[in-house]
């Protein structure tokens, strides 16, 4: 008997609250790669350049990472990451900006505060189920593009040169439909997980 684990990602959202005069501002983002993470963190640090801490955790293609950013070790990033993993989230970055209010919370309350940040933002957000799929290149011409079958796929890049090259995220079933349409050459770049459908948990 096989155990099937459903994986989910999440749509971008923001939440904030205050505990003992410290403000916690939480963001959650859908990410595709480490470049997304770097860009998001740079934008946040520019916008909140006077914050005390920028704590974050992410799960990307089932690889995970967290940082406490000068909070006591294990009290900040890890609690956020644990909540992400508990909810089977993937391709997700959660960032908590803290403005220290002058009152030290202590290790236990601080851990609970960061856990609350992650839990609340997830409850407020749209969850999207993931399924197995592919990142592909479709090499065709303008006639082929006009004859694309009406299927769910995410076109992430278009290159119009001598030939038209679309970079597409697509699930297995729709890849077969695209192949059977015979509108061009298909190259599989890599196996990935793609969005399945929107749902609230």
Walk through the language-model features, giving the residues of each.
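Helix N-cap motif at beta-to-alpha junctions
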Residues: 33-35, 141-145, 169-176
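C-terminal regulatory domains involved in ligand/effector binding and gene-expression control
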Residues: 6-75, 157-162, 172, 187-201
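Short amphipathic alpha-helix segments
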Residues: 137-154, 177-178
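Terminal alpha-helical anchor/extension segments at protein ends
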Residues: 113-122, 140, 186-201
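Active-site beta-strand/loop microenvironment that shapes enzyme catalytic pockets
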Residues: 79-124
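Long, charged alpha-helical interface segments
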Residues: 162-172, 176-184
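Short glycine-/aliphatic-rich beta-strand segments at the starts of folded cytosolic domains
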Residues: 126-142
